[in-house]
Amino acid sequence: MRIDILSIFPEMFGPLNQSIVGKAQDKGILELHTHDFRENATNKQRHVDDMPYGGGQGMLLMPQPIFDTMDKIPQKPEKPARVILLDPAGKKFDQKMAEELSQEEQLIFICGHYEGYDERIKTLVTDEISLGDFVLTGGEVAATVMVDAVVRLIPGVLGKVASHEDDSFSSGLLEYPQYTRPEDFRGMKVPEVLMSGHHENIRKWRLKESLRKTLERRPDLLDKYEPNEEELKMLQLLRENVQDVVE
């Protein structure tokens, strides 16, 4: 995969050269490029923003520097890149979207600053995406998060496919609790079932705990989750237990 990031602060993406994303680059699985679109500004002061027509607060990113930067980024004519505009008004980013984007050959992220974008910039864009229902100073932090979430899903980046398939949200549920050595730490013991070696009992425990955590912390996820018969029975028991505690 090739990822291009347009930003006036390209130095903010240094962390993407470390850890999993850095290793993906070392393996040749990922090609990551940052582009300072200020370098393509044609005015003497190299401004990339200006006042909005019609008045209003703040400054808007001008189209020219971004268009000219995009013109210099190589793309395959037969399979153009997905071009993502980081915008708080965009569609909210989630695990399903990360999985979808990980299937692409090329992604381009445009990071905004100031009050917003000149509307004409959006003619370059295939997707407008938001990290969440809040406003950041710029799009760089959001782009970093999204790149990390996407790259780890590319085949060959993580050691085993199961490494990310068991992650929270990958199955539609939150991940079950996990433990490592020692068996007993300051009186806190590892659940016996996990040391039993009984794979079916371990599977059932993990599923139940995953459902329990989701029910307690993110019940909204269950609204769009389609449980099987086994999961329905577990959820019913968990809800009954919660009701007993309330009463």
UniProtKB/Swiss-Prot annotation:
BP-aspect Gene Ontology terms = tRNA N1-guanine methylation
Q: Where are the transmembrane segments?
A: none
The molecular function GO annotations come to: tRNA (guanine(37)-N1)-methyltransferase activity
Q: For this UniProt entry, what is the primary localization, expressed as one broad class?
A: cytoplasm
- Which reactions are catalysed by this chain? guanosine(37) in tRNA + S-adenosyl-L-methionine = N(1)-methylguanosine(37) in tRNA + S-adenosyl-L-homocysteine + H(+)
Key words, A-Z: Cytoplasm, Methyltransferase, S-adenosyl-L-methionine, Transferase, tRNA processing
**Record-linked CDD domains:** TrmD-like
Q: Which InterPro entries has this protein been placed in?
A: Alpha/beta_knot_MTases (IPR029028), tRNA_m1G_MeTrfase_C_sf (IPR023148), tRNA_m1G_MeTrfase_TrmD (IPR002649), tRNA_m1G_MTases_N (IPR029026), tRNA_MeTrfase_TRMD/TRM10 (IPR016009)
Q: How does it assemble?
A: Homodimer.
NCBIfam families in alphabetical order: PRK00026.1, trmD
Q: Which named protein is this?
A: tRNA (guanine-N(1)-)-methyltransferase
Which species is this record about? Answer: Lactococcus lactis subsp. lactis (strain IL1403) (Streptococcus lactis)
